[in-house]
């Protein structure tokens, strides 16, 4: 089973690809792991950027949601707008 921290690392990497390399993940106020992910199974990450540096995310395999939650992002200058 892929550890939850590895999934969250993938979520952070997806956010950096979308928002830019100067952004970093500063916290996860809410995370729910709903199903295990087996190594080698493909999954997709959907992101929804909100106000105040809050990003909602959903991780899904072909047939189920495996994790969802929200994270806080910041730049070197502070919270993302």
Write out the residue ranges for each language-model feature.
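Hydrophobic beta-strand-centered segment that forms part of the acyl-chain substrate-binding groove
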Residues: 11-46
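Generic ordered-secondary-structure signal
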Residues: 7, 17-18, 26-27, 64, ...
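Aromatic-residue detector
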Residues: 2, 28-30, 57
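HotDog/MaoC-like acyl-thioester-processing domains
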Residues: 39, 48-81
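Hot-dog-fold acyl-thioester-processing enzymes
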Residues: 1-18, 80-81
């Amino acid at each position: 089973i892929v550890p939850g921290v590895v999934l969250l690392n993938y979520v952070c990497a997806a956010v950096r690809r979308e928002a830019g390399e100067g952004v970093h993940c500063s916290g996860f106020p809410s995370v729910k792991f709903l199903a295990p992910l087996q190594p080698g199974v493909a999954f997709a990450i959907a992101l929804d950027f909100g106000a105040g540096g809050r990003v909602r995310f959903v991780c899904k395999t072909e047939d189920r949601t495996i994790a969802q939650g929200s994270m806080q992002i910041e730049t070197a200058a502070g919270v993302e707008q």
